[in-house]
């Protein structure tokens, strides 16, 4: 619960600093960036201080400064595949964003007013990211749960945690798909992120098209998060790494050859 409190404090502080830097101080986009950095830095500092004060075993000692080759190797072996999962996600977003731009181009030198394809994709992607965050959180929680129980050799709890995560993800995927489809009615979700003047029939058309294709596959996405994090927690990092590479290649090829 304590990490959640630090997250809440970070969000509230971010909102307060956004208002302070943008309205009275008139710092614009730079002010918004500073607000984000400062709020996250202060929350991280608070979390570190709390952890070191509350848990004596986490405090630094002189012997901790001595590098351990085996420990460094384990961090790299397990950390790179896990980090690549997030890199894969954001690289994929960049690739897909580049594939959307041609839909707004009239010719090689001019574009459609308002860039409706980019606007529609961008906003639908934000909604999708919010809904996908549920499955990402389940996967992350499962990773920690399985890792701890593997260390404690409580393999029956690993099986129960895996089964429960699958059942919960199935239920939540139906909820997310239903909610997402309801929000596509008249492009309702776009009004959460944009002013009325920035929304057009074309932006709604493009955004809804993205969601109509993506939403039905949330159940598959949920099992991807569960499967990857389970295998990662069992210290088998090669398979999540290879699946991430395959996913990135597939995403790239689809963006290159499928759009028309």
Where are these regions (language model features)?
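Hydrophobic/aromatic residues within transmembrane alpha-helices of membrane transport systems
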Residues: 9, 21, 28, 38, ...
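Alpha-helical transmembrane segments and their lipid-water interface positions
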Residues: 14, 18, 22, 43-51, ...
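Hydrophobic alpha-helical transmembrane segments in multi-pass membrane proteins
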Residues: 11, 44, 82-94, 98, ...
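Small-residue-rich hydrophobic transmembrane alpha-helices
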Residues: 2-3, 118-184, 221-243
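Membrane-interface helix-loop junctions in multi-pass transport and translocation proteins
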Residues: 11-44, 114, 238, 248-260
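Hydrophobic faces of transmembrane alpha-helices in multi-pass small-molecule transporters and flippases
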Residues: 1-8, 46-49, 64-95, 130, ...
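Helix-terminus/linker motif at the lipid-water interface of multi-pass membrane proteins
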Residues: 20-27, 87-124, 130, 148, ...
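Short alpha-helical transmembrane segments in multi-pass integral membrane proteins
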Residues: 26-80, 146-217, 260
């Amino acid at each position: 619960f304590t990490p959640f409190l630090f997250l809440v404090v970070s969000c509230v502080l971010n909102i307060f600093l956004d208002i302070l830097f943008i309205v009275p101080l008139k710092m614009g986009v730079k002010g918004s960036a500073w607000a984000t950095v400062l709020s996250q830095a202060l929350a991280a500092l608070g979390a570190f201080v709390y952890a070191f004060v509350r848990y004596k075993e986490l405090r630094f000692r002189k012997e901790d400064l001595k590098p351990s080759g085996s420990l460094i190797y384990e961090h790299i072996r397990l950390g790179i595949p896990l980090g690549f999962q997030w890199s894969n996600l954001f690289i994929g977003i960049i690739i897909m964003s580049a594939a959307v731009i041609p839909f707004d181009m009239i010719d090689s030198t001019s574009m459609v007013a308002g860039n409706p394809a980019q606007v529609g994709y961008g906003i639908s992607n934000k909604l999708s990211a919010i809904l996908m965050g549920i499955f990402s959180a389940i996967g992350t929680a499962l990773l920690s749960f399985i890792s701890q129980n593997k260390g404690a050799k409580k393999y029956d709890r690993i099986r129960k945690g895996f089964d429960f995560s699958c059942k919960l993800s199935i239920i939540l995927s139906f909820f997310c798909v239903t909610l997402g489809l309801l929000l596509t009615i008249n492009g309702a979700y776009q009004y959460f992120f944009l002013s009325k003047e920035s929304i057009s029939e074309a932006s709604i058309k493009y955004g809804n098209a993205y969601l109509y294709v993506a939403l039905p596959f949330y159940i598959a996405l949920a099992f991807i998060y569960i499967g990857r994090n389970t295998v990662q927690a069992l210290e088998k990092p090669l398979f999540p790494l290879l699946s991430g590479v395959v996913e990135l290649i597939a995403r790239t090829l689809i963006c290159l050859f499928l759009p028309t």
